[in-house]
């Protein structure tokens, strides 16, 4: 009997150590704000001649900043909601937003909680991204001019996770498009952690749950089974940020006979399947050079780099899916 209690104490100590380590890892990545680098020359709305109507809406008792973008609206019954990825803001996706606007759509995009122009002392956790999207859709639906429009949600990476799982909270969304998405927080963490520490993904997800609520536990593998709208997922097999096999590959195995879910794989696009191969190549060369420099020279490189070539788009297939 004594050995039983000794074993129990040892197990509890190990669990406590794992939780403390999980808190430390979670805080390292999410217990801070993200502000867009002022030296990075992103595309701007003015370059594309877009109109911009800036708004704010509530999420977790804070104000998130977003905007409605348009050019020549040809599809007035549709609204695209665009969700940015991790460690970026809507500024980094202005070329994507402009593409849809130039093709006749109105787009609403926003900075997530704790990101750039939005309030929030920190990002809080990955689950907060889904909560922010939930709040954004509720806000849009509260506006008389938009409440009856068909909503199409597009997201990249973290935004892709949000796009796939928001269907649980808003099942009437017409379409969702996910670019290099992770299907759950647990799965993306498994891919990012060293293999021997993969079990820590469960503990970090628990910490995310305590901070963000049930949004942190959502899994597209389950939620897409109940979704009657159309879903399109595009993911590069060589993605080094969101592991394909642990996310989209797993989804493909579990949802093989769902005619409303289209999964497409590409290669040589790494974590940006919406970019041309040349843009991805240039981006990787830039990042490799950037990481080899000290801080002073990094600033010089950023100020001298034309980021437009690094973000050239390849969105023809996505546009066809939206219009079908």
Where are these regions (language model features)?
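The serine-hydrolase catalytic nucleophile loop
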Residues: 86-99
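Short alpha-helix in the alpha/beta-hydrolase fold that links the catalytic acid
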Residues: 243-253, 279
């Amino acid at each position: 009997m004594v050995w039983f209690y000794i074993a129990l104490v040892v197990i509890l100590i190990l669990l406590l150590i794992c939780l403390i380590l999980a808190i430390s890892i979670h805080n390292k990545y999410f217990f801070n704000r993200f502000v867009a680098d002022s030296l990075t020359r992103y595309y701007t709305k003015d370059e594309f001649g877009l109109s911009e109507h800036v708004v704010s809406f509530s999420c977790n008792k804070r104000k998130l900043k977003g905007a409605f973008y348009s050019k020549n609206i040809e599809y007035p019954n549709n609204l695209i909601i665009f969700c940015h990825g991790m460690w970026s803001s809507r500024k980094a996706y202005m070329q994507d937003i402009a593409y849809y606007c130039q093709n006749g759509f109105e787009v609403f995009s926003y900075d997530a909680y704790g990101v750039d122009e939005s309030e929030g002392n920190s990002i809080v956790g990955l689950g907060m991204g889904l909560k922010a999207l939930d709040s954004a859709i509720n806000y849009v639906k509260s506006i008389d001019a938009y409440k009856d429009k068909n909503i199409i949600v597009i997201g990249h990476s973290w935004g892709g996770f949000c796009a796939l799982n928001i269907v649980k909270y808003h099942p009437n969304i017409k379409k969702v498009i996910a670019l290099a998405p992770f299907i759950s927080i647990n799965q993306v963490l498994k891919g990012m952690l060293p293999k021997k520490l993969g079990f820590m993904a469960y503990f970090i997800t628990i910490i995310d749950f305590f901070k963000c609520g049930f949004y942190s536990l959502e899994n597209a593998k389950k939620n897409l089974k109940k979704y009657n709208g159309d879903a399109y997922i595009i993911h590069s097999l060589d993605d080094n940020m969101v592991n394909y096999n642990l996310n989209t590959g797993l989804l493909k195995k579990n949802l093989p006979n769902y005619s409303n879910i289209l999964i497409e794989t590409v290669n040589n696009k790494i974590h940006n399947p919406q970019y041309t191969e040349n843009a991805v190549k240039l981006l990787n060369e830039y990042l490799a050079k950037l990481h080899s420099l000290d801080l002073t020279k990094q600033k010089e490189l950023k100020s001298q780099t034309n980021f437009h070539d690094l973000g050239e788009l390849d969105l023809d297939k996505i546009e066809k899916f939206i219009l079908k």
